């Protein structure tokens, strides 16, 4: 009896060893850009669009022109990832969304608080849910499949693959006001140049390349004929490519917790000259925007140093003169700041990459960048220092 029992046990063990549970789980091949919807970091984010590389001959293209910063909230809709500007007059209000970061739905006419969050943009994409493929007996085969059940509510889908090249921008920004698309037509579809999607750690960055052609009616406004020997030579500049960088970064990655804002009277601004941020506040009694508030723009004075990166082209051999001059200038500035003493609230400027390129894009909100434009531009762009500010 015992021998027979042992034999049966051995056969059972052998069969168990050949089952699906011991096989490696075979996952569906995923797009590299795919993210889990639950991983979208909760809270508010900063958003800034920036024009990237542009041809030097394009009169209406301003390379590395920073758009206006936006303080936003994010949630998923059926169309994709929606970016909405927060309601500054009610800073404690938040977009309604469920545990998986899908936007809430207003069930009643009176429940309309969500419309107070201005539309900024939508990143379209595809949603998916996955499950284990089952055999005829309903057992898992250790092979994953996409859940194609038509009755599955989109809010039950667990993953999102963005299509940033189909970006839908709703807001007006500085790029629109400065004529980035005025007098030109876009040709074809944008091309995704680079991307860094890590929503769990508060990062959604990407860069698009777009192709434009000057409208025939505006050709004299957007081609500098004075620099051309003939009409044929001038017409070559009638079409071009430009790049646009979009940076979405969670506030925890860039804002200093506990920072105290400084009110900055207009009289002081006229005498001293710091950059400022102005806004109008809603009076809760009169329901009118009758309060002007001006804040001083500054770095957090309590940090040890203000870190800057140099753009990659500083380290090209032809630009060594600019590199040396920049480093020497920063040293002189720090010497002047040190005169005020260590307790003066004036951190020194630190160049992080003094000897080699760091691959940091000037449009990435996580970094301060000194960007070298090392060739003459037909639009006459001069040096300027745009900054993003906490609202």
Q: Where are the model-predicted features located?
A:
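Conserved small-residue hinge/capping positions at short loops/turns
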Residues: 346-356
């Amino acid at each position: 009896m015992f021998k027979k029992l042992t034999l049966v046990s051995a056969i059972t063990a052998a069969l168990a060893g050949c089952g699906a549970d011991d096989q490696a789980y075979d996952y569906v091949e995923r797009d590299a850009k795919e993210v889990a919807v639950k991983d979208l970091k909760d809270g508010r984010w900063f958003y800034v669009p920036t024009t990237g590389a542009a041809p030097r001959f394009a009169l209406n293209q301003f390379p590395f022109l920073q758009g206006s910063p936006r303080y936003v909230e994010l949630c998923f809709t059926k169309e994709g990832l929606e970016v909405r500007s927060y309601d500054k007059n009610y800073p404690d209000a938040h977009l309604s969304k469920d545990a998986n970061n899908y936007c809430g739905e207003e069930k009643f006419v009176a429940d309309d608080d969500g419309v107070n969050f201005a539309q900024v943009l939508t990143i379209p994409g595809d949603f998916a849910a996955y499950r284990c493929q089952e055999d005829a007996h309903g057992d898992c085969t250790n092979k994953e499949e996409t859940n194609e059940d038509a009755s599955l509510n989109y809010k039950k889908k667990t993953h999102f693959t963005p299509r940033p090249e189909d970006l839908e921008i709703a807001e007006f920004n500085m790029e629109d006001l400065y004529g980035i698309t005025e007098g030109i037509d876009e040709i074809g579809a944008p091309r995704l140049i680079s991307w860094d999607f890590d929503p769990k750690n508060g990062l959604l960055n990407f860069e698009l390349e777009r192709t434009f052609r000057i409208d025939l009616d505006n050709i004299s406004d957007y081609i500098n004929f004075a620099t051309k020997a003939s009409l044929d030579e001038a017409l070559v500049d009638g079409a071009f490519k430009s790049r646009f960088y979009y940076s979405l970064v969670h506030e925890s990655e860039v804002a200093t917790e506990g920072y105290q804002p400084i009110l900055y009277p207009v009289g002081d601004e006229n005498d001293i000259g710091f950059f400022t941020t102005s806004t109008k506040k809603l009076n809760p009694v009169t329901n009118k925007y009758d309060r002007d508030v001006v804040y001083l723009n500054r770095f957090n004075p309590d940090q040890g140093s203000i870190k800057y990166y140099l753009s990659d082209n500083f380290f090209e051999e032809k630009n060594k003169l600019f590199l040396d001059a920049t480093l020497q200038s920063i040293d002189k500035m720090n010497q002047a700041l040190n005169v005020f003493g260590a307790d003066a609230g004036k951190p020194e400027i630190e160049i992080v990459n003094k000897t080699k390129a760091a691959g940091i894009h000037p449009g990435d909100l996580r970094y301060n960048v000194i960007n070298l434009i090392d060739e003459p531009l037909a639009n006459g762009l001069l040096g300027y220092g745009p900054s993003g500010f906490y609202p």
